[in-house]
Amino acid sequence: MDEKSLAPKNLEDYELSIRKRPESIYPSFPRKGETNQTTTHYCAGCGHGIIHKLIAECMDELGIQERCVMISPVGCSVFAYYYFNCGNVQTAHGRAPAVATGISRAEDNAIVMSYQGDGDLASIGLNETLQAANRGEKIAVFFVNNTVYGMTGGQMAPTTLVGEKTVTCQTGRDPDLSLIHISEPTRLGMIS
């Protein structure tokens, strides 16, 4: 498929493409157990829903939904299985890269995606994430950084910004911790 065939033909088609639900997202979410089966459970202002839509749109555009396995560790990331219509494995806190590595090595045709928040990736799972990157494992890691532990009430995370106030850091964060700088020695293809 070339770029021209993907481009909307007119403004009306473009507006429809923006509102269209990706096929890689379930049309309703009965697993979450609430009355309204078509809305997500994420907090107002949270970026998870937007990130889900972007990932699902890419899965659709690339035609890889049937090959995808989403790794969902503890934290708000664990709820990805409510929304993504693809394989999903829920893992213990910080262990997503290890599970993703195992699946990727066992199922060569699988497209393995680890969807991790800052509590999981930047805290308890930092070592596993860096080691998987250093080994060059065939996994995609989506790091959702909202600078706090959102699921448990907004406590300070390793990614909390200098001066940012949280429930557990009411005068503002002190020293800076940059995961980008920590990751640089791994010589990854892309760090942003």
Predicted regions mapped to residue ranges:
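Conserved beta-ketoacyl condensing-enzyme motif
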Residues: 62-80
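Thiamine diphosphate
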Residues: 74-150
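Flexible, glycine/proline-enriched loop segments at strand-loop-helix junctions
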Residues: 41-45, 115-119, 164-175, 187
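Single conserved hydrophobic/aromatic residue that forms the stacking wall/gate
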Residues: 180-192
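Conserved active-site and cofactor/substrate-binding residues in soluble primary-metabolism enzymes
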Residues: 49-54, 65, 94-98, 107, ...
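Iron-sulfur (Fe-S) cluster-binding modules
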Residues: 1-42, 48-68
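Glycine/charged-rich beta-loop-alpha catalytic/anionic-binding loops adjacent to active sites
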Residues: 30-40, 78-89, 110-113, 161-167
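Phosphate/pyrophosphate-binding betaalpha-module
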Residues: 128, 134-179, 183
